[in-house]
Regions:
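Asp-based, Mg2+/Mn2+-dependent phosphohydrolase catalytic module
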Residues: 1-3, 106, 119-229
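N-terminal helical cap/lid subdomain that shapes the substrate entry/recognition surface
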Residues: 2-8, 13-99, 121
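Conserved residues at beta->alpha junctions
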Residues: 12, 114-117, 178
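Hydrophobic residues in well-ordered beta-strands that form the structural core
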Residues: 16, 114-116, 196
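Short glycine/serine/threonine/alanine-rich loop segments
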Residues: 39, 68, 110, 169, ...
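Substrate-recognition element of Asp-dependent hydrolases with the DxDx(T/V) motif
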Residues: 74-92, 100-130, 136-145
């Protein structure tokens, strides 16, 4: 495969988000839902999970059914700077990538774009902490995934088709590196190559028919990417 265009996921791909960041975000989302919909926390957690399962993102359900401002939701659920007195109040305490990450990304041939369902401000902070801001041609965050006045995060087909046109990339030259099999499955249908980053995956599945390559690290990706055909 010559000079691919890489679309890298962020959380649980370029760093471990499951240990500290995701638990905080999930708790913040539950608090937001409880406050806005006047529910207790158990009910709010059920709503959050139901919308996530139904729409692929809690945000989409809140926008569709409750007219929630998406920018308010993203801001309120990613305010790590507000956690004074907590080990989470500084992302530098909890964000770390594998050794030599910047060098590995820079040596990987092809264009590189960050594609994340997280908000832009959060993504930029994480990239800064990892020291890899300069490794990416662009950052495509959830705020950039609006198509026809609707928010369409991964694994939406219209959104990725728009990005392929934007970067003048044929589907067969694009590679999605992601920890979420559902995203890989959907985009493989459009002809993209798919790399399953499974280092931080806690539940495995036997249905991997839509995965072009499986890796445990960016180092392994660097060593084996030419297996993509």
């Amino acid at each position: 495969m010559r000079r691919p265009v890489w679309f890298f996921d962020l959380d649980n791909t370029l760093h471990d988000a499951s240990s500290h960041i995701f638990p905080y975000i999930n708790d913040a989302m539950t608090s937001f839902v409880a406050r806005r919909l006047h529910l207790d926390r158990d009910e709010a957690s059920q709503v959050r999970n139901r919308y996530w399962q139904q729409y692929g993102a809690t945000l989409l359900g809140l926008v569709k059914h409750h007219a929630v401002d998406p920018h308010d939701f993203l801001y309120e659920t990613h305010r790590f700077d507000e956690l004074s007195g907590s080990h989470l109040n500084d992302l530098s305490n909890i964000v770390s990538g594998e050794k030599g990450l910047r060098q590995l990304l820079n040596r990987l041939p092809g264009r590189k774009i960050l594609l994340t369902n997280a908000p832009r401000a959060y993504a930029q902070k994480v990239l800064q902490e990892l020291g890899i801001v300069g490794c990416f041609e662009a950052v495509e965050a959830i705020e950039d995934m609006e198509v026809h006045q609707q928010w369409r995060p991964k694994p939406d087909h219209l959104m990725i088709r728009r990005l392929l046109r934007k970067y003048r990339c044929a589907p067969h030259r694009a590679v999605l590196v992601d920890d979420t099999l559902g995203h890989l499955r959907e985009y493989s249908k459009l002809g993209l190559k798919t790399v399953w980053f499974k280092r931080h995956v806690r539940t495995y599945t036997h249905n991997r028919s839509n995965v072009s390559l499986e890796v445990q690290s960016i180092h392994q990706l660097f060593k084996s990417w030419q297996k993509l055909k």
